[in-house]
Each structure stands twice: as C-alpha cells, then as structure tokens.
Amino acid sequence: MKANRFFMTAIFSIIGVLAAAQPWMMRPQGPANEFSAMEGSSVLNYNLQMERDIHSRAGYGPAFYIFPDSKLDNNQALELAGKLDLVNIIKEYGGRIMVVNPSSDKWQEQDLENFRRLIGMGGSPTNVKVIGIGSGATFVNRHLAATDLTGVIAGIVSIDGEPGKICKLPVPAFIGGKNAAKTAKPYQSTSDAAPADPLQKVVVNTDKKASLETLFAEAWDKVLSENYRYNNLYRTFYMSRGIDNPEGVKNFELVSIPVFEKLGIQRNVVEYPLVDMNAPSRPENPDKYLWYEYIPKQALDAAPGTIPLVVLFHGHGNDPRTQSESSGFIELAAEEGFMVVEMEWQGSNGYQPMGLDGIEAVISVIRQKYPQIDGSRIYAEGLSAGAMTSNMLGVRKSHLFAAVAGHSGGIFSGNGLGYYSYGSEPLMNEAIQKRGHVEVGFCSVVGTHDDTIRYLNKDNWEGNPYLNVWRIYETINGMPVTGDLDFNVDPTFGFALQDRTTIHTGKSEDITIEFGQLYKDEKPMIRLMVINNYGHWNFKPAARLIWDFFRHFSRDTETKELRYQ
C-alpha cells in the first residue's frame, strides 16, 4: 500500500471535479474587481482579483448569492456589494459574490431551478450564503426556503421580504426589516424542531427603520460569519461534485468558523529566516519557515511554565491555516487556555519544508519567545499527511512530546521511500529499540468512509496504515502487540478494547464515534476513535476527546519520563 496511490487518487478526483465544472466557475470572465454577466444567464459574477496572502484566513470563504429587489446591472451590483462590505469579506476569507437577477421581469419557478443548477456546478459547495432583499427576499422565503436546498445553504438573510409558509430543513437565518417577526416564524419553527446546535440560529431584527447596511452587518456578525457547511457523510466532501449525492444526504453538516475576536484569540503570523539577519553577508531573500501562533487571552500574561502547547500539522498540500481553523482546537484553546501553533511543515509558496528536526527547532524558538509555555506539556496533532507527521514525531521525538494524535492518517507499510520517509518498517524498528524505555500517549481518529486512506475491514486489515501505527505505539509503550484481527470480536476494531462505547455527537444520528482504549498499568496509553459513516477530514467534536486524552500526560523535562495524572 503506497502513499502516492492514495493521495494521487484524491488529487485526480479533485482535478476531475474541476474539469467537469463550467469554465466561468474557474476564472474571472470580465474585468478584475468588477461584475460581469455570466454567459447564457441573468447572473452577475464578481471577478475577484485574488490578493489573499499569509495574513488572510484559511478559506471556506462565503459564496454570496444576492437575490435583489429588482434587476441590477454591473454598476448597481458593484454599488450594492460595496454597501454590504462583501468585497472586503471575500478578500479576507476567499469566496465569491453573485447577483442572481430574475430571468424575466418577475421572479418565477425557473429562477429556483437556475439557482439549484448554479450552486450544483463544480465541487461540493461548502459555504453558500443567500441574501434576499425586497422582492428577492420574498422569493427566497416563499420558494427557495420550501426546498431541500435549505440543507445545503449555510445562511439565509431576508430583508424587507414577505413571509413564506414553510422552511423545509433547518438553516441559519437572519430576518430583518419589514414583516420580520412574521417572516421569521417558518425558519424558527423548523429550527426549534431540529437537534440543539448553537450554529443553527434564527436572529430577528424588527427595526423597520434600520438601514440595509446596518441589518447586513448584524447578519454577518451574528449568523453568517460563524459557520459553513459540508457533506462529509458517507464520503470525503472535497471529492464530491455539486449538491447531489447517491446516498441522498439532504442536511449538510454545519461547522463552526473560529472568529478570533469573539474567542479572545490573538493570531500571529511568523516568517522565520533561516540565516542570521544581522550578518553582513546575509542573502537578500533568505529561506524561511512559516508558522501561525494562536494565543488565548488567558495565556498572554500567564506565569512561566504554566501553558500547554498543541502543535498542529495540515494535510498534504493544504493551506498552513487549515488544521487550526478546521480541527476545533482553536475553539478549545479559547476555553481551556492552551496555546496552538500550526506549522507549514511541508513547505510551499517559497517556504522551506521543516522536517522533524526543523519542527523541533521551531518549538525551541517558540518556547524562548513565550516563557509561559510548559515544556512538559507539548502535544502534536495532524490531519492526513499531517497525521503521519504527528505519528512520526511521537516516536522519533519522544523526548519532546507527551502525547500525539493523528486524524485520518496512519503510517504506510514499507521502508518509506517516496513519501517523506513515512514508512512502517523504520518507525517500528525505532519503537522496538525504545520499548521498555520510552512511553508516549497516542490517539487515533479515522472515519469509516475515508476514501483517501481507507479504514481497515476484514478484507484489507493486513498492512493497513491505521493498524500499522497502532502496533507501533503498542510496541514503543511496552504493551501487548495486536495480532490478526477478528471482526467477530469487535465489528469496528477487530480486537478487544477497554472503555468500549459508542458516542452520540449530536451532529447526526448517522455520525457516531466508536470509542475504545488500550491500557498499561491502569493507564490508558492509547485511545482509538472511529467515526461511523465519515470521510477523510476533520470532525470537530473529536478535538475535545483528543484534548481530554492529552491533558493527562506530561513529560519530565529533565529525565524525559512520561507522567500520567
């Protein structure tokens, strides 16, 4: 089983999605930073000149679809986008702006089908935001809200519209202006009947005199900025095309976007030159490392040696902000008070790959910069290839980390040639050498429907990357090593675990976590979690379960002995 095969499958799947999309979805079709008509439709598309840099956000940018009170031309669309501050939003987050004009003089059923087709083109939508104004809001309330598209849309804003009768599926919404209280009722009724979710909210402003700008600013602040949606149920979301899926999933998962100001998180962007910048012969453009620091307010002035550090690693080819913004650890840091650092470990866009020694060196720099960090409580977590990095670090840098976790990633079989030297043979050899001398807490998380690094079953368990890494950590921790699997013993794991339970996450009855642990001397050294029906990506509720595992482990900074409490 080779790393390249799995990752190239994912890459070619994404390429296939893009190739199948319409050309206007790929590149601006008019002057930069202006609106232009999309060929063969009444829709106007804002042609964003991409200017996002290392200081912007990871992505999941909103795709704004504006249903105006009356048909707008290009200049009117630009004026409206300016009023609502949409251009600045998509410059920070990425995304797009489209004005969905009616296809004739009045809104009609055909406009609904046009919209369905519009958001169904290209890859799976993740952050559809609908803005209805006046008659456009009436159309949204009476027609769009009555369809299953509400399970795909991440937020609806209705301003000065007439009310509809039903909202088919729960959708976050902001209702303002005329008729707001009455218009909100179908949205509220559907929301109230849904399982409790802080992201599933309906906010109402009944001030008839409030300006459009004021109402939308409130909508962005209280509803739209806080979430996005994807469908990672039964498949990996970025390998899907459009809004349709053979499994018939209607209600896409709502996921939080960390809003740093509200969380009390300070984010620092660090470019670190790999030469002495005071040397007279330094190069003009030296090689650099890149990382991101996330510091909760309670950690800013904390006493020396009191703040844990969680180091995150993104997946193969991902943006170096992806893991921090999509894993759930930033939200947890705000609650629990630990610091988070995400590293551009892989190297991209002119930044150097770190390697395992570089990662250790960066942590040393960060500890010198922030004396409040507790060197005995340093942890690592990653996604996919970042999970492999984290899994490697727990063995190769066992003196540094108290515990590590991998989400959607194990260790591939073989000698590691061809993929960052991540092979099970050399890592197992090191684990064997350290067995009886070194202990490391280890947590593994994977979805049963991971179609990039497939989870194990009765047909593929031999040499499976997840079983490889579980055995490696059993070995280094001096525990019995799992042999052949028997899915009659446990239909999920294939062997017996303690504390075995099924956790209901509140997200969906289809998304539950199979949970179990392996003990040594009454200490749970290995925590395994398998997410039923989930694809190859982060599942935010798992972050708390990982942190609850991490927090019990520390490593003596002098003797390097692992401690559990």
Placement of each model-derived feature along the sequence:
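Alpha/beta-hydrolase
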Residues: 66-68, 159, 313, 407, ...
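Bacterial N-terminal signal peptides that target proteins for export
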Residues: 1-10
